[in-house]
């Protein structure tokens, strides 16, 4: 009976909380792009809340005869009366002289996230005419490209595989075309980009360095169809969107390289061929009850083929053809169902699929006219990774002081560590061979996470995000339970300056073995095991942001990151050989990085841009590689980045430039040589990464002309 009364009490309590009066809605700009971190306040009572990343808000205990104020940096303050229990779209106007073509990143006042609308990414200088999301991110302090010309992302002393890159919530395992010279994302299909450089909410996990969120265009302030065609020195592309306002949307984005089409078809099949493509499809429908269904699909592929002919003079000038083919591709798909349970409670159910596979084929065919069939040798090596994810995320506006988010996430991840199909046939006096070396079967790991987070508004000046993420990981009999606390404190000073401090802990249960170069398609994704332990990191960061007049803003950030169980390859030949156990070629160590970052932006007027400077240091300790601590390969203590853009909505010309100057890249060079007791010449090294190349500088300048329709 006591249990019965207790259940009645709890049910009454829950219903009373859910029945609180409130007003809710979404804050957008004039193009209906969501505006995050807008302060929504009821002046009469002091009740206040902030919009989330989707621009949505819920304000409780609302007095029907009062007006709400909407304030945020860069937009005119708005006062508006809103009705009870209705979802209202609130439009805000940018302040006078704000340049809509500004490419600057908006810094989050309530967290450490940098966000940007990609509407005018084409105004930025770019490589061979290709607007590139990754190169845009490389212009932020603390994010480096590594090797010159590549679109890799090394965030605050971390490796490429330590970035969680999400396309509409689905992880992508290789984001590069052309061996890293270009990213796989068509800039026109990406509406918003957000990056958290280590400080992310409890909702995200599984990587040490960053969370990068790429969202495709899903809304529009009109009903109709529009499209774009483009051609660059690399690709030809098309973008189509069909929008029925408040009902549904459909988007299609596709690119393909075109230079190979100039080569005769016979040559492409027999001698040389290289092409890339990617396409993205999005569809969404708004249901009658206010719920929403979204579908997203993405496919990318690179293909490179070379065939060489030679003559075996030792055996009667017999022609021999050698062929090398490399192909890698991504396939991503996701379905999201957004459900508004009550005016205060929203949940999103999601399922996603992500697959990456790399194939390397080698063939040797001998044209011996004395034989009925040509002798043939082939090697077909495959490696890859794929996962299926299920998750449910809840957002609950419990009160104006407490905004809760919680949920669970399940990922079934499968690894193809290396399967080499060896074929030999049609050789005289030899039996045909068709065998597989390595393991052709996928090996499965399971990663289950539960998280909860409370955005607690102590007062109008102080906000605390306190979260906890717990993950259970299992693979091949190895099980690990980890807890990841997340704390973000925000303090608004009287002059609207912002001070922030945060602590995050992260764990990573996948590693990418670098077989020569970070970001290469040949690198192998491997699971954490009982021998190769999961990576983890602890990160501390403080930040200060200030508005400088109406046109300028500045930020300063300092961070310290400690990393454990980092992985490195000790023997490249054994690690790349599918016949051998990859774990025997991997050693683990630790690392740390720290730095100080400055960023100064101008967002208004015809000329906009930013200047950033970062001082940083990143070191590694791998006792099995070298006894002492050494610098991380992509450690660059000093880096200055300048971006400028001159344009306005009436000008037919756009001018922009990027300038980077900083410390050179590290290499390992011998300091001497000697002969051992057997008389063999040996090289002497004093440490790893002991030589730094000269000062690095790069300047990119672009000018563009656009047609303006005066009708």
Sequence positions of predicted segments:
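Periplasm-facing N-terminal accessory domains of Gram-negative outer-membrane beta-barrel systems
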Residues: 18-100, 145
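Short, acidic, small-residue-rich periplasmic hinge/interaction motif at the N-terminus
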Residues: 41-43, 71-75, 83-125, 134-135, ...
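Periplasmic N-terminal accessory/gating domains of Gram-negative outer-membrane beta-barrel systems
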Residues: 109-163, 169-200, 217
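Conserved C-terminal beta-signal and adjacent last beta-strands/turns
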Residues: 241, 284, 632-711
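Face-selective signature of the C-terminal outer-membrane beta-barrel domain
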Residues: 281-303, 324-478, 492, 552-560, ...
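Surface-exposed extracellular loop regions of Gram-negative outer-membrane beta-barrel proteins
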Residues: 309-314, 422, 495-539, 560-583, ...
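Outer membrane beta-barrel strand-and-loop segments of large Gram-negative receptors
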Residues: 383, 387-391, 438-444, 449, ...
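Gram-negative outer-membrane beta-barrel transporters
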Residues: 560-562, 580, 584-671
